[in-house]
Amino acid sequence: MQTPGVLLLILGLLDASSSALIRIPLRKFTSIRRTMTEVGGSVEDLILKGPITKYSMQSSPRTKEPVSELLKNYLDAQYYGEIGIGTPPQCFTVVFDTGSSNLWVPSIHCKLLDIACWVHHKYNSDKSSTYVKNGTSFDIHYGSGSLSGYLSQDTVSVPCKSDLGGIKVEKQIFGEATKQPGVVFIAAKFDGILGMGYPFISVNKVLPVFDNLMKQKLVEKNIFSFYLNRDPTGQPGGELMLGGTDSRYYHGELSYLNVTRKAYWQVHMDQLEVGSELTLCKGGCEAIVDTGTSLLVGPVDEVKELQKAIGAVPLIQGEYMIPCEKVSSLPIITFKLGGQNYELHPEKYILKVSQAGKTICLSGFMGMDIPPPSGPLWILGDVFIGCYYTVFDREYNRVGFAKAATL
């Protein structure tokens, strides 16, 4: 028979673990870009001509205050998890995106010609006992047009299914999308987006889900962490943990960098080295840590230098190809952050993909110029995060990295 002291200790441990840590399994799917390429379609036919700007901050002509204009695409997003909205929860697959701050899902009231809405789960306020009408219109500007709809309030369950444990974020304002831009989202495997950036970039100044979660004291620590499985065939695709970290997913100690601007998860990068032949970001630069971006993104001219240094040749859609037989001889690329070296070996920054029945090797780097005042910026997307377990700390406004474990 257990002694009362032992029983109390066990119950205390169980209670601490259930209240402090929330695990959301992540699944990995084929990205929109790859889906379109595999069926012979051109992404360029689906989006506006010219480059897609992902990040832009501009001033309001009337108030002179900074106004966030999120020009973000999810062509390369690959990792999704499930949340619930309403009571009982209606389940949705979302991208947990540290590069934006709003939650939106398709609405049951979406426009008749919104084909993307037809093929995704839709929120129905009539089926929720905790729904509260808001009705304020919202618009999020993407490279392919404007996603629009109206705001509503309801309970958000993370994750959706109660048998996985989880939390309920009450009185969460979110977007019901009634119109999605172009036809890009038709090919998306996800229903919506759950932004995990700072409130500063939230459209309509809506309190982000994680901020509401902190306000309601639903986790012991105000942090969340990502493990992304980079095995192309591996499932689960990874795990998002709310309220803590899991040492099973990384080796050694976490090294932290302070957030330099509380909008995106922005940090200072000392420099970037391509083997011993090329140094980029000389004198330091700014970088965004973004779970909603699959690739590594940098200023166009610098990325062109990098592609040339690794022998990559341009394809369409801004992609660069490497002969697969040369991958093993490519240089190590080193990101210097906070005085620490974060190395990416060629098999990590070169992506093997299927195209027209053949396997080709693509560079994991893409060039994109982000204009001032936000830019220029580098974006450390899933290629980097897959190699380094990443902690987003709102308690101390910092980002932590440690070498990811291979499971």
Curated annotation (Swiss-Prot):
- What's the catalysed reaction? Specificity similar to, but narrower than, that of pepsin A. Does not cleave the 4-Gln-|-His-5 bond in B chain of insulin
Might you name a Gene Ontology BP term for this protein? lipoprotein catabolic process
Q: What class of enzyme is it?
A: hydrolase
Give the EC number(s) listed in the UniProt record: 3.4.23.5
* One Gene Ontology CC term in the entry: extracellular space
Q: Which UniProt keywords apply?
A: Aspartyl protease, Disulfide bond, Glycoprotein, Hydrolase, Lysosome, Protease, Secreted, Signal, Zymogen
Name the UniProt record assigns to this protein: Cathepsin D
Q: What gene codes for this chain?
A: Ctsd
